[in-house]
Amino acid sequence: MSRKPIIAGNWKMNKNPQEAKAFVEAVVSKLPSNDLVDVAVAAPAVDLVTTIEAAKDSVLKVAAQNCYFENSGAYTGETSPKVLADMGADYVVIGHSERRDYFHETDEDINKKAKAIFANGLTPIICCGESLETYEAGQAVAFVGAQVSAALEGLSAEQVASLVLAYEPIWAIGTGKSATQEDAQSMCKAVRDVVAADFGQEVADKVRVQYGGSVKPENIKEYMACPDVDGALVGGASLEADSFLALLDFVN
């Protein structure tokens, strides 16, 4: 079946509110119509209000880069999914390898966050991916499959069909070393196969699977030609308006 592609820029810990506003103003008038592709930017928490306001009345969607799994309480430094929904966010990125690595987030944490995100009417973009050591040992499919199964545990079929999974091999994030087209296709298909095993083929045919890891305007077309790649989660190439817009040229 035909799945609408989704291109999401992950700014990580970059841009102040003024820079975020300038970026959004530079891109919104040049975006393709959202019948062809969904386009989002994941802004740092300090930029979300500005980014959401600047993107209002455009096809650009806004994602948070993380949230907690409780709506309120004594959780100093955390971000409430309920407040994100109240602010007008659309997506929340969870499970990024940088969160797993630097902040010791577990599969259980990510599963709780996914449930909290859905409970507040938002859509999770759930990241998964293996280290170079795991990849070279031939264990990537098993490792990533376990991440996906754990993240989706207890969700409904309808919820899983509507979310986004982002396969990002850790060895390709910000390294300039990107997966081959064949690797991206085989791993995104493996992610979809896990969904099929856990929730059925109909759900697997609907869920969107992104590839991420040193995606840029020069290589996005080859990834988007893969039957099981439904978009990209993009870091460095999403920081400048021109390169971000160039990522969308595959639509034409």
UniProtKB/Swiss-Prot annotation:
Alphabetized PROSITE patterns for the sequence: TIM_1 (PS00171), TIM_2 (PS51440)
Enzyme class label: isomerase
Single GO MF annotation: triose-phosphate isomerase activity
Amino acids binding substrate: 10-12, 174, 214, 235-236
Catalytic activity, as annotated: D-glyceraldehyde 3-phosphate = dihydroxyacetone phosphate
Listed CDD domains: TIM
Keyword terms: Cytoplasm, Gluconeogenesis, Glycolysis, Isomerase
GO cellular component, as recorded: cytosol
Pathway in which this enzyme or protein is active: Carbohydrate biosynthesis; gluconeogenesis; Carbohydrate degradation; glycolysis; D-glyceraldehyde 3-phosphate from glycerone phosphate: step 1/1
EC number: 5.3.1.1
InterPro entries according to UniProt: Aldolase_TIM, TIM_sf, TrioseP_Isoase_bac/euk, Triosephosphate_isomerase, Triosephosphate_isomerase_AS
Entries under SUPFAM superfamilies matching the protein: Triosephosphate isomerase (TIM) (SSF51351)
Assembly notes: Homodimer.
Family the UniProt entry places it in: Belongs to the triosephosphate isomerase family.
Chain's role: Involved in the gluconeogenesis. Catalyzes stereospecifically the conversion of dihydroxyacetone phosphate (DHAP) to D-glyceraldehyde-3-phosphate (G3P).
NCBIfam families assigned: tim
This protein's name: Triosephosphate isomerase
Organism encoding this protein: Streptococcus equi subsp. zooepidemicus (strain MGCS10565)
Gene of this entry: tpiA
